Amino acid sequence: MAKISKRRQAFAAKVDRQKLYAIEEALSLVKECASAKFDESIDVAVQLGIDAKKSDQVVRGSVVLPAGTGKSVRVAVFAQGEKAEQARAAGAEIVGMEDLAEQIKAGQMDFDIVIASPDTMRIVGTLGQILGPRGLMPNPKVGTVTPDVATAVKNAKAGQVQFRVDKAGIIHATIGRASFEPTALRSNLSALIEALQKAKPATSKGVYLRKIALSSTMGVGVRVDQGTLAAQ
């Protein structure tokens, strides 16, 4: 732990917490810090100009990152008949109805995302207290309650990430791994920012994207100059 602290302190000394770094430099600094023995995730925190206490200003959605997340995702799907077959063909590891619900109630949750066809919500709705606290409850706002379960499965496998603003008005998301090329991380970040722009509440006033900061799993935050995101 002492070694980690020393490494973190050494990196922190290189970063001016008040400075806005061009995206290329910010990514370079973050990747430099990601020197742990595992492939650290590269995360982004976006401070939004919204009032998270107001229900009409809750920002929530999903986006498929063009370069993926670098993570293997196991998908469970509530569907029956033809839709169940389509889900399996699309790559879903677990497909079921009441049997899947019973597995979940028994604590057997070997999956990372749950997708549901609308006609199965009578079953899924009974699992809210189990799936909700784990962030696994299907929701149409993030595309996990849909009649097109096959596409939802493919999106999840392709690197779809869900986002939801927290109580402080901040969006937290992973845009890749330290092993990713800077161009891949940048394209993923751009896709996320574009999705956030599209999800902007009509009642949000003033500056919407207030602050953007990047960090690795074990690193410190590096603030990004938003003006450099559009530059190619």
From Swiss-Prot:
Xref: InterPro entries: Ribosom_uL1_bac-type, Ribosomal_uL1, Ribosomal_uL1-like, Ribosomal_uL1/biogenesis, Ribosomal_uL1_3-a/b-sand, Ribosomal_uL1_CS
Biological-process GO terms, alphabetical: regulation of translation; translation
Top-level lineage group: Bacteria
Oxidoreductase in keyword set: no
PROSITE patterns from the UniProt entry: RIBOSOMAL_L1 (PS01199)
Keywords: Repressor, Ribonucleoprotein, Ribosomal protein, RNA-binding, rRNA-binding, Translation regulation, tRNA-binding
GO terms under cellular component: cytosolic large ribosomal subunit
Molecular function (Gene Ontology), one example: structural constituent of ribosome
Homology family: Belongs to the universal ribosomal protein uL1 family.
Quaternary structure (record): Part of the 50S ribosomal subunit.
NCBIfam families reported in the protein's UniProt record: rplA_bact (TIGR01169)
UniProt function note: Binds directly to 23S rRNA. The L1 stalk is quite mobile in the ribosome, and is involved in E site tRNA release. Protein L1 is also a translational repressor protein, it controls the translation of the L11 operon by binding to its mRNA.
Protein name according to UniProt: Large ribosomal subunit protein uL1
Organism: Burkholderia lata (strain ATCC 17760 / DSM 23089 / LMG 22485 / NCIMB 9086 / R18194 / 383)
Gene name for this UniProt entry: rplA
